[in-house]
Amino acid sequence: MPSIGPIPTIPDEGSRGSSATAAPRRAMASYRDTTLGGRAEGVAFSAVEDSYTSSVSLARMLYGGDLEEWVRHTRPGVSLEIQSRAPVRFPPPNNPSSRRVTVVRAPMGSGKTTALLKWLGEALDAPDISALVVSCRRSFTRTLAKRFNDAELPGFATYFTSTDYTMAGEPFRRLLVQIESLHRVDDNLLNNYDILVLDEVMSTIGQLYSPTMVHLNKVDALLTRLLKTCPRVIAMDATANAQLVDFLASARGERSVHVIINSFAAPGFSQRDGTLLRTLGTDVLRAALGFVLVDDENGTKVMETDSRPISARLREVNSAGFFGRLMDRLVAGRNVCVFSSTVSFSEIVARFCSQFTDSILVLNSLRPSEDVAFWGGVRVLIYTTVVTVGLSFDTAHFHSMFAYVKPMSHGPDMVSVYQSLGRVRELIHNELLVYVDSSGARAEPIFTPMLLNHVVSRQGGWPAEFSQVTDALCCQFKARCGPAYRTASTRGLALFVRFKYKHFFERCTLASVGDSINILYTLLESNQMRVAIEGCQFPLTAAGFCDFLQDLRLDAYAARKEIKQLRGPGGIAATPTEVFENDDVAVFIQKYLRPGVAHDEILALLVELNSPIVREQFVNVAVLGACLRLPAALESPEVFAGVYKHYASGVVPVISDAGALESVSITPDVNVLARWDLYKSCTRHARDLAWDPSRGGSGLDMSEDFITNTLSADYNRFQSLLVEIAKCNVTPLEMLAAGAVRGVTTALSGRPKSRVPLSKGEHAVSLFKVLWEDVFGAKLAKSTQTFPGGVRVKNLRKDEIVALLESVNVNHSECKTHRELYALLMCNRKLFAGPRYKLRAPKWSRNLCFLELDNTGTCKTPLDAALADLAPSAWPQVYGAVDFDAL
């Protein structure tokens, strides 16, 4: 573990002395009194509020590990039932003493849905009793419908069987609906349901934050109303937490709420042993696929084909790591299932496994789905998060499970990973082997881990300095989340605003591989699984955990280049005729692109737009260009909203991973005012830098001081907006300026020891980089030119040399000729020696209709049409302008 040095004595609050831990202690004190808005905003505070500011217990609290203690201390009027050693049992529905609302927290495989079916069978004892079941996903709705049918629960319809958009009348009095279609249920029905069921309730609420949630305001209002008024409510989840119970107790009264906490887990989970692996083993992968690394003439490692038999190739590699262990089990004739958090890796694993068996089933977004009943017919099952809640394979067919998890800013989050790992209920050898790829974690120093592993803490193994620093970081994160979504745009959203902290936590912690591991560790243990780290003896120590993170980081970065080379080339199956005669493509070209873009460039763009991240950034660049062309958008929130919704709504054509042309719906962010706030500053940046994607990016070089000054006016606001818009939690400069904080956070990031404080300039450059990269896809690159500007030294004109000399206050009055000025400039070249940066535009943005050009006009017409319905009063009034609204 990187040494943090001796832990000094912490001075009393009144002391003027300094210490390595003074900064984190001051930060803790600074953030201690900042809350998420109190109970009025729905954050469940226990009697000991430190759960939100404890780096050890935060994950456990957010996933309901402290629910029993919290109910006893904070909501004593809520009835509490503790169950263990047996599957979930519901109170009889017809018992007069039964409460109106029942919340069930129980692990996967504890019989929650089975108990629900039994309860509904008794509760629906009369044909006039109605019920609404709200699920988180379409696939889960189908699974529930099948189970309801198998249980012979009569009269249930599903929303996808409705022939009309609005579901109304007797056929839908018993209905299963996915939350995103809740607005399609007729109000008369919604006001009269007798029973509301939310299976996987936390995932259902989490769906409110999905970019596919088109009717957020209406769905939020309807679900809130149902939770407050429906006569009987059943809410179940393995991670049901205090926030949920607190909301229901506030809405219905404590005496109406009954909480069941069941700790039983089926043997398929409770006897499962999980191991976090240190290495991926790309040497085994490379050998199996028939490649070998050789040195080229420059000494660089390159991959070449190895034509030897596979047995000869594999004899030369060490069968360790993820692929080595997978190979051993396949060679031994065992059946394995493999979870991959990315589609591309699932395809690589399929190619690897095909060297040992032909009996392989791959379930991802590129391939057709397959009924769970057929899983038992293959030796190897490979799946992604397309297989999630609702699907269960209960047969003891697979011997072992492997999991590849790559935390990335766009997900999947660790709860989704955990849910996918639970789809195979029985493993013959009860073996789960997990490799967490850290190459997708954020490398910028302004992103820091904030969680400590609870197992190390259980053994008393974390130094006090680690706890103080990470607790302060948790306080900072809590304070950062508090003001989010408090604008007129989000007014009226009850559940969306109330559960925001958990959403931010799950997204922001994806920046850190250590945080992601600690969350997954917590979730697996909550399901009664035993988890260990390869190479770490019991008890797990702080040094052992940090060494593991360092090994993991080094292995992942070494493997990343090889994985990229081994990835199969993609192709475009759609023909040019099919693409360019498509109506959605025609509308897209007119709406977003400048005239005359070549067909091959458009095809390349559609391939890039298959990425959800690129789609978001593409829209953001389009909006930025519109704000530069239409300054009124920066003066009026109504005009900006019109511009933003024009570009962020509708459909975008993409070329999928399979090469097919598809149309993807896009939905504007609900928090338009926060985006307006951000764009006002970013438009100023773009104007000052002469940033134009069609010309490759910025027209000027930037020094560290220039970037610092550019951000200074809105520095803190940028950090807050990045949480709301990009789901990035930037650690503030005042914390990273402390050597102790730097020492702890580098150790928890698996990086070499560094107690060197981050300077103001370094923090500003990193913040600027993240802002433009995450929101607009731009890259901040160091300039290699001797002098600022885009002109080579030998091509500098006289006036350009004068401008350079004056920029560093060099007197040039004695120099009259170009030769003299040039000589003076070269004599003072050291004044330009500091690092300078260029802001490069992403390649996919270069054909966007960005700035007003002589031949532009196509993208202006649809934008003008979109803004035509704005009231005259929405447009800013300038001096001398006529106020048409007043005429």
Curated annotation (Swiss-Prot):
Record-annotated Helicase ATP-binding domain positions: 93-258
Cross-referenced SUPFAM superfamilies: P-loop containing nucleoside triphosphate hydrolases
Keyword Nucleotide-binding: yes
Keywords, comma-separated and alphabetical: ATP-binding, DNA replication, DNA-binding, Host nucleus, Nucleotide-binding
One Pfam family matching this protein: Herpes_ori_bp
Superkingdom per UniProt: Viruses
Stretches that traverse the bilayer: none
GO molecular function, one term: DNA replication origin binding
Cellular component, GO annotation: host cell nucleus
Region feature (Disordered): 1-28
BP-aspect Gene Ontology terms: DNA replication
Subcellular location: Host nucleus
Main localization, broad class: host cell
Record-stated family: Belongs to the herpesviridae OriBP family.
Protein name as catalogued: Replication origin-binding protein
Taxonomic source organism: Equine herpesvirus 1 (strain Ab4p) (EHV-1)
